[in-house]
Structures are given as C-alpha cells and as structure tokens.
Amino acid sequence: MQKGIYYSFLPGEKPEDKFSWARTLGFDCVEIPTLRTQEEREYFKLAAENTGVRIPSIMNSDHWGAPFSAPEPEVRAKGMACLQQSLDTALAVGADTVLIVPAVVTPQVRFEDAWTRSQAELKTIVPEFEKNKIYMAIEDVGNKILLSPPEMARYIDDFASPYVAAYFDVGNVIPYGYPEHWILTLGSRIKKMHIKGYSAKTRTSTPDLLSGTIDWPAVMKAIRDVGYDDVLTAELRGVGNTAYDCCKSISEDMDKILEM
C-alpha cells in the first residue's frame, strides 16, 4: 500500500513545493481538488511528474454547495458541471478516481428523494467515466444518507457499472459503525480510502491518527482480507506548530498503522 495525503495539508504554496514536501515527508501520493482550467491541470501534472509524486484521485469540489440531490435543477446542473471538471482533471493529471459526495439529506430533501434524484443525475455521466476508465467513487460522510454498509453497497450496485465504486473513509463511519465491518461488506467495491483519527467517546475528530478509538489492527486486517492494496490518503491536520511538523506526525503515524 502507498501513503497519500490531501493537497491542502502540505506545507508550501505552489504545487511543486507541496509535492516536493510530500516526497520529503515520506508520502507517495497527493490527492488534489477539482482544477477548473486545462492550463492549471497541466501545471499540476508537470509538478507531480517532476517531483515523483502520483496523483491518484480528485476530490470533487462542489458536491456540498451544489448537491446532485438538490430539488432545484439549476443547482444540480452546477454540481454536474463541476463533476465534469473533476473528470477532466483526472484525465489530465493521470488520476484514476474522482471522489464524490453523492447526495445530501436536509429538512427540505427527504432520504428517498435524495437517493432517486442523485442517481438519476449521476447515471447521465457514468458512460463518460466508463469510456475513460475512471472510477466515480462514493464517499461515506455525514450527509445523512448511506449510513450503513449494505445501504452504501446497494446504492453503488444500482448503477451496475464497474466504474462506480466506494471511496471509503475510515474515520467518517465511527459515529454510527465500525470501519472494519464496512470494509468487509464493501469489499472489492472500495477503490480508494481516506484515513483520519476519530474518538467515539467525544464524537469528534482527532488531530492525529492514533489517539482516538479506531481499532487500527482490526481495520488493517479487514483491508488485507478484502485485498485492498492501493493508496491510503490521510485527511487530517496532524499534530505540530507548523504544516511540516503536522505532516511529519501524520507520516510517522501511518508508518505505524501500515505495520499493524
């Protein structure tokens, strides 16, 4: 397995600086956000190549502000336009996965409507993902939908496409489940993984990976049992007074976890 981290947590301002620090700190991969222009995408691609960093995935940028489940067609259209930009970013930089939050339940949007509207929208772009062999990966997150492993598996399977998959976040499920259970149920559907720290006792994220209540040995056993061998991408601040110190602490924690 490779070690990854999300772009914004790294020290530096320019892509080449952040990617260089990633390598110095022991990370193989860096996940990046949606890039809006082809010029920017080419810039990131060159910076990654020059520093030896792999960009495995794109975090879609507008799925909270413009959810695919919104009742307003113009909001859904904005979300879909951003998803197309995310796909274009993946193609330009060589990533094979786009992370999305598929739907958001709100006081105005019921569970059933969020499910059906989001699937109807996303099914229109699935052929583009299939044609380009890019995974559209559904993340488990606090969106009040897909709150159990079978539910998430069914949502993914409804697309009947090998390129609609799971982007599993180990920390996000702690308030309502056990990540090792989710991993075993989702199995080969998982194409990418986020890791972060979380304490079930305080119901809050932790700044480091190891001080919370996640059973990392059980998680790592489940990961190996389902045959996952891609990147683990850290999505947390880390511990320290500078971005360098924080990322160094994350990298060291990840080394310990990978040995479990």
Model-derived regions, located:
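Residue-level preference for long, well-ordered alpha-helices that form the structural scaffold
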Residues: 72-79, 111-114, 118, 182, ...
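Generic structural signal for well-ordered alpha-helices
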Residues: 19, 41-45, 83-88, 119-126, ...
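Active-site acidic/histidine proton-transfer and metal-coordination neighborhood
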Residues: 50, 69-165, 175
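Acidic-and-aromatic substrate-binding clefts and catalytic sites of carbohydrate-active enzymes
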Residues: 8-15, 31-43, 67-68, 106-109, ...
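Hydrophobic faces of well-ordered beta-strands that scaffold small-molecule active sites
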Residues: 2-7, 30-32, 55-60, 98-100, ...
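Acidic/histidine-rich catalytic cores of soluble enzymes
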Residues: 13, 23, 58, 123-213, ...
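N-terminal pre-domain/capping segments
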Residues: 1-91, 161, 188, 200, ...
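H/E-rich (His + Asp/Glu) clusters that bind or coordinate divalent metals
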Residues: 214-219, 226, 231-232
